[in-house]
Amino acid sequence: MILQDALRLNIHGAKAAYSLGNFWYANRQYDNAIACWEHSAAINPAYPTVWRNLSLAYYNKRDDKQKALETLEKAYALDEHDSRILMELDQLYKRLGRPHSERLAFLEAHLPEVEQRDDLSIERITLYNQSGRYAEAKELIAARNFHPWEGGEGKITGQYVLCRVELAKIALSEKRYADALVLLDETDAYPFNLGEGKLANAEENDIWYYKGEAFRGLGNEQQAIDCFTKATIGSSEPQQAFFYNDQQPDKIFYQGLAWRALVERIRHAAALTN
């Protein structure tokens, strides 16, 4: 093989060792790949991509999380303008259970790179939502034009809905029923900047339930009943969601809340007629 010959003729050829490692990894010769990359990194430790490749191999093929972390952090330290390595490092932090506050602080220390990528921008928004900072997440979503990618379907629309539902729940707890309804109505259709439309079969038991609560708070009993009825629709069998458009298991919980609300109204109506 040409790369093997090149390395044999020049044992200090860092690029040849790196490229040979790429060949071995692509052909599932993982130990050979790691050996080549380690050799390349020893010769030229200033090349970030070889450290990044070693990190992926350590994590995925040797289950060595500590070495994966050390090498990926080294790769990013060598080139902090590489937004892809930043994304991969944040994903590694996520897998290793790094606290939300630390991940968010890390991303916000590198905002120019975060803003280069939709996936990083969505992670930042997700961290805001997970930290209970829903209004800030809502503002960030409105300020960016997103582009769908394979494997990323439903990510930004999910965060768009989540922050509005959570803000609506806060409004309901404060008896601001009209404000809650405005927020929930914003989930009826998605704005163009999300880059994705709403699926025809979207399961929205939670949204319909909270709309029912808002209408009940406003004294509109019939519309509340209509919303609670819509919130009962869907499968009541718990099942794992494999795809983003599958029914999420928590929707069954809101079906139950909606049925309880309807039963309470039936009992109330029966009590009034007796």
Spans of model-derived segments:
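Single-residue signature of alpha-solenoid repeat helices
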Residues: 33, 68, 102-103, 137, ...
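Residue-level recognition of tetratricopeptide repeat
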Residues: 22, 56-57, 91, 126, ...
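Conserved structural position within tetratricopeptide repeats
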Residues: 5-8, 38-42, 73-77, 109-112, ...
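Residue-level detector of the short coil/turn that links helix A to helix B
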Residues: 28, 62-63, 97-98, 132, ...
